[in-house]
From Swiss-Prot:
Binding-site list for substrate: R49, G50, A51, R92, Q199, N250, K251
Catalytic activity from the UniProt record: 5-(methylsulfanyl)-alpha-D-ribose 1-phosphate = 5-(methylsulfanyl)-D-ribulose 1-phosphate
Active site residues according to the UniProt entry: D240 (proton donor)
Protein name: Methylthioribose-1-phosphate isomerase
InterPro entries xref list: IF-2B-related, IF-M1Pi, IF_2B-like_C, Initiation_fac_2B_a/b/d, M1Pi_N, NagB/RpiA_transferase-like
NCBIfam families on file: eIF-2B_rel (TIGR00524), PRK05720.1 (NF004326), salvage_mtnA (TIGR00512)
Length: 349
């Protein structure tokens, strides 16, 4: 049976409330942010994560910060607001949605030349709310499109967490799973644990169980074995940034899963809103890859598991070349190869 759900981010009066995903699934605790600096900190320390959710958080941080700016006139306000936009934009580098949301609100402010400061406050808050609402509606549409590629009784594998916790609600890849399950409760879902931060084990399994959808947790290094045994029929993952040719940055290990899926003839789909597409990048070579602290690899639950002094690489993302991707599921339809042309058309829709 579905359980009560706490959204990952929402307004709590004049504060931004963020569900602390670092504590899940053991504890549900909310961080109440009263300044944009607190929201940025929550993004950086991964209390909130997932490209669409981070984009929404960035928009809400701007709305929160706008009313704190002391400015006697619109010109002064816009100058200070531009500085705030730069601070929020750089919170995490790989995901496209944060920069997209910040640029969208900044352009709105710059485009309203006759608005006074109170009016600008109103416009910023309204746009942040619209970004949140659009994300949820887009995710539901992604799910509706995505369920059409899921065979009846299929074994679906997903990686990391591209669910309600990674968005404003409902989810992208997990949104496809939700919609597929509603249409066919006979599907089987496999969630990779996703080391080292264990987003699959901690978050995807948590929210699927909350939704009443049966799920089996698997180790990352069992993907090939399960595929070879015919247990996986389709793979659906999310995305943090998609280049103009369809190359896709997602959680580290996605590339490995895509290669294995291709080897075994298994369809591999990326589910993401158009706001994740970065048309300024011709291919995945230009996608910035966030490097996180080695301690996330050398320690587990605060305890060292590697020898003292051991070196560790901890790239948070990798890039899957478009040749391994069967299709990109967006809110306006499923994009097929050649992705360059399909992406250009989707961005015009």
């Amino acid at each position: 049976m579905p359980q009560q759900w706490l959204p990952p981010i929402y307004w709590d009066g004049d504060a931004v409330a963020i569900l602390d995903q670092r504590l899940l699934p053991q504890r549900e605790a909310v961080i109440r942010c009263t300044s944009p600096k607190q929201v940025v900190a929550a993004i950086k320390n991964m209390a909130i994560r997932g490209a669409p959710a981070v984009g929404v958080a960035g928009a809400m941080a701007l709305a929160l910060g706008a009313v704190l700016i002391q400015a006697a006139d619109a010109r002064t306000f816009k100058s200070k607001f531009a500085r705030l936009c730069r601070q929020v934009r750089t919170a995490r580098p790989t995901g496209r949605n944060l920069g997209w949301a910040v640029d969208r609100i900044h352009a709105l402010v710059e485009g309203n030349r006759d608005a006074d400061v109170p009016r600008l406050h109103e416009l910023i808050r309204r746009e942040a709310d619209l970004i949140l609402a659009e994300d949820v509606a887009g995710n539901v549409a992604i799910g509706s499109w995505g369920k059409t590629v899921i065979p009846r009784g299929a074994g679906i594998m997903t990686y990391c967490n591209a669910g309600a916790l990674a968005t404003a609600d409902y989810g992208t890849a997990v949104g496809v799973i939700r919609a597929a399950f509603d249409a066919d409760p006979g599907i089987r879902v496999f969630s990779c644990e996703t080391r080292p931060f264990l987003q699959g084990a901690r978050l995807t399994v948590y929210e699927l169980m909350k939704a009443g959808i049966p799920v089996t947790l698997i180790t990352d290094n069992s993907i090939g074995s399960l595929m070879s045994r015919g247990m996986i029929d389709v793979v659906v993952v999310g995305a943090d940034r998609i280049a103009a040719n369809g190359d896709t940055a997602n959680k580290i290990g996605t590339y490995m899963a895509a290669v294995l899926a291709c080897t075994h003839g298994i369809p591999f789909y990326v589910a993401a809103p158009r706001s994740t597409i970065d048309a300024s990048l011709p291919d995945g070579d230009g996608i910035p890859i966030e490097q996180r602290a080695p301690k996330e690899v050398t320690h587990f639950n605060g305890r060292r598991v590697a020898p003292q002094g051991a070196a560790a690489l901890n790239a948070a993302f990798d890039v899957t070349p478009n040749k391994y991707i069967t299709g990109i599921i967006t809110e306006v339809g499923i994009l097929s190869k050649p992705f360059g042309r399909a992406i250009r058309q989707a961005l015009k829709a």
